[in-house]
Amino acid sequence: MLKVLFAGTPDVAVPSLKLLAQDTEHFEVVAVLTRPDAPTGRGRKLVANPVKQAALELGLPVIESDPSEETFVSELAATGAQAAAVVAYGKILKQDVLDALPMGWYNLHFSLLPQWRGAAPVQRSIWAGEKVTGATVFRIVRAMDAGPILAQSTVEIGAHETAGELLGRLAEDGSHLLAASLQALADDQIAPVEQPAGAYEVAQKITVEDAHIRFDVPVFAADRQIRACTPNPGAWCELHAHADAEPATLHVLRAQPADMSNPNAPASLEPGHIVAGKKNVWVGTSTEPLELLEVKAQGKKAMRAADWARGAHLDNAFCE
């Protein structure tokens, strides 16, 4: 039985933690390393992250110490862990920490490494228009996402899939890949293989400004941007509803290239200009229009775009 330290923080790490904790035939999760409680919401109350909540529900010891502290290595040794399983922990680990466990630290990364090393691999793969992505389990080294690979699995990216939806699928699929890889490693059935050399895309974090929708691009590019930025940080534009209206932020939660077989769909629109029908709302791009399906207006709840348009008093409206 492999004694494992689990390290993770957000909800995408929970499936892996639960799978390892429940597979008591092959694993003993000796402790869970996670980020400390953080202030959340308007009241700024301290709230435990999803991994800590899951660990407590599973009755597992929780470590919230900073890995940069001098006492951290001895704290690790006290757990008796042989290896660490890491999923979106969110902290850089020093070499002495990486050397502290006999079998090393193994990370589940949501891309087919070496492509898309970095913070936002799922979002960047959608934005780039890739058809296939996947998950990689690799041994952590000091260089970012550059360690030798244990295993990989692939998934197809759905034509209308958002980053949040794809990440949810990868988190579930990847949990099985991580468990199988660690089990095979413990049984000496696999060994890490160095990543191929070459130039690959880096998955830089997507900022709020990155999520500002561009309509002066082909419809497929606007669609990819929206899906890549959903749900976080959230795709948005500056709405000018009519001549007397103040500009307001409009979040686009779901959209798709217009169905040009719909007789009501405009053949073309100026980039950013909005046309609303009884059941549809379209906005122009540099090619075909983009159909807005679900939006969230400033100060309002999320709703179907057609319902929003009926109450928005749109007149020569446009987004920029």
Swiss-Prot record:
**Record-listed E.C. numbers:** 2.1.2.9
Supply the enzyme class, top level.
Answer: transferase
Q: Which UniProt keywords apply?
A: Protein biosynthesis, Transferase
The record, for HAMAP family, names: Formyl_trans
The UniProt GO MF terms for this protein read:
methionyl-tRNA formyltransferase activity
The answer to whether keyword DNA-binding applies is: no
Name it.
Methionyl-tRNA formyltransferase
- List the top taxonomic levels of the source: Bacteria, Bacillati, Actinomycetota, Actinomycetes, Bifidobacteriales
Family named by the database record: Belongs to the Fmt family.
Catalysed reaction(s)?
L-methionyl-tRNA(fMet) + (6R)-10-formyltetrahydrofolate = N-formyl-L-methionyl-tRNA(fMet) + (6S)-5,6,7,8-tetrahydrofolate + H(+)
Q: Pull one GO CC term from this UniProt entry.
A: cytosol
Q: Does the keyword Protein biosynthesis apply?
A: yes
What role is this protein assigned? Attaches a formyl group to the free amino group of methionyl-tRNA(fMet). The formyl group appears to play a dual role in the initiator identity of N-formylmethionyl-tRNA by promoting its recognition by IF2 and preventing the misappropriation of this tRNA by the elongation apparatus.
Q: Where does (6S)-5,6,7,8-tetrahydrofolate bind?
A: S111, L112, L113, P114
